[in-house]
A protein has these predicted regions:
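ATP-dependent adenylation/nucleotidyltransferase module used to activate substrates
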Residues: 1-166, 177, 187, 193
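Conserved small/polar residues in nucleotide/adenosyl-binding loops
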Residues: 373-375
Length: 375
């Protein structure tokens, strides 16, 4: 995407409209600031279950109707783009692969990477639009000294979404605008109320859009036609202590729903997908100090050349924890926390910060206790 050459025209902005209040207010703010806005909603699934009463997700038919109504009220062009085939290939199929390999995927991060900030940026460029705008609570700024684009936390700490945006590249950040980054959610709802938007009081989406009821194992069986067989629960010594209903149904750190009576609380500590076993143990077994990551994207720096002090999150909305990050291969890093962390899980993202700036992040591939690492 090239920068605007004709300074006499107003810059164009593609607004990624989910049908929720955040993207609607983002559209209004951009229009207020003089941008020619075009509203776009991505159709990602054909699953009509997302319209089930009481389930708050995104991309349903009701959401499309809400987005269209807001666009009409703002008098801006609006289209629905069908990305269902690519969404299945890049998001749903990967989601299933990661679970079947024993990990815990984060499809919302993949959707941002492959759909919102890839497909929509290319569509915007093809249609002469300068920016893609979303309703994420994060900030994009340019470092005057280095010229690098930076991703920073949203000012509303409770709504900050920088964690799910760590994959943004320099080229993408140059053409992304996040107008809600400096606002609090209460301010956003107040604007929507003032403008009379139909979704001003709409609940935030809370679930994976293609698994609105949260039963991901049932979704996987329905989608693939597979049946995930029962297997053995093992204790940390390898002794069988029960029977589980399929290893994919359990996540690291899980306590509820195990159906085990062992005299003390136990948690899922490990899974062996080839053997179809799930290891359970005391909560102390969940704590690890070392995290290895790959598929790394650096934002604030071009590359990691030596150890750096950082704070880090291994899950969404976690309080950041102090750590030191070290280079590890051409596309990876090793992160050593100052204190052991509860249940860092392969497949999840680990995102690194310096202050309110995202340094970069990657996908967790392995974890270990400090005593098992020889540096």
């Amino acid at each position: 995407m090239t920068e605007t050459q004709n300074t006499s025209r107003r810059p164009g902005a593609l607004i990624a409209m989910s049908g929720g209040v955040d993207s609607s207010v983002a559209a209004w703010l951009m229009q207020r600031d003089g941008f020619d806005c075009t509203g776009i909603t991505m159709r990602l699934t054909r699953n009509e279950a997302v319209d089930t009463e009481g389930l708050h997700t995104c991309c349903s038919e009701r959401d499309i109707e809400d987005a269209a109504e807001v666009a009409y009220a703002m008098d801006i062009p609006y289209e629905v783009l069908d990305f269902t085939a690519d969404f299945q290939e890049k998001i749903i199929d990967k989601f299933i692969r990661v679970y079947e390999a024993g990990g815990t995927p984060n499809p919302c991060i993949d959707c941002n990477k492959y759909m919102k900030f890839d497909h929509l940026l290319r569509w915007a460029e093809a249609h002469g639009l300068d920016y893609v705008v979303t309703g994420h609570y994060a900030r994009v700024e340019q470092d005057e000294a280095t010229g690098r684009w930076l991703l920073k936390k949203g000012l509303d700490e409770g709504k900050d979404q920088s964690y799910v945006l760590y994959n943004l590249t320099q080229e993408q950040l140059a053409h992304v605008r996040l107008p809600l980054g400096g606002l609090h959610k209460s301010e956003v709802r107040a604007i929507a109320e003032e403008q009379g938007f139909v979704n001003a009081r709409k609940h935030d989406s809370q679930d994976i859009c293609f698994v609105p009821d949260g039963d991901y194992a049932r979704f996987m069986e329905d989608f693939t036609g597979k049946h995930y067989p029962a297997g053995d629960f093992l204790d940390v010594s390898g002794k069988k202590v029960g029977t589980h209903s399929g290893a994919v149904r359990y996540t690291i750190g899980q306590r509820k729903g195990l159906g085990l009576a062992m005299g003390a609380p136990v948690y899922v500590c490990a899974k062996d997908m080839q053997a179809n076993t799930v290891t359970v143990g005391p909560e102390a077994e969940l704590f690890d100090t070392i995290v290895y990551a790959n598929e790394v994207n650096w934002i604030a720096i071009p590359e990691l050349t030596g150890p750096l002090r950082v704070t880090a999150r291994t899950r969404y909305h976690q309080v950041e924890q102090p750590a030191t990050v070290y280079p590890a291969g051409p596309d990876g890093f090793r992160l050593e926390f100052d204190q052991p962390q509860r249940a860092p899980t392969p497949g999840q993202a680990v995102v690194l910060y310096q202050g309110d700036t995202v340094l970069g992040g990657g996908t967790i591939v392995r974890v270990a206790k400090l005593s098992l690492i020889h540096i």
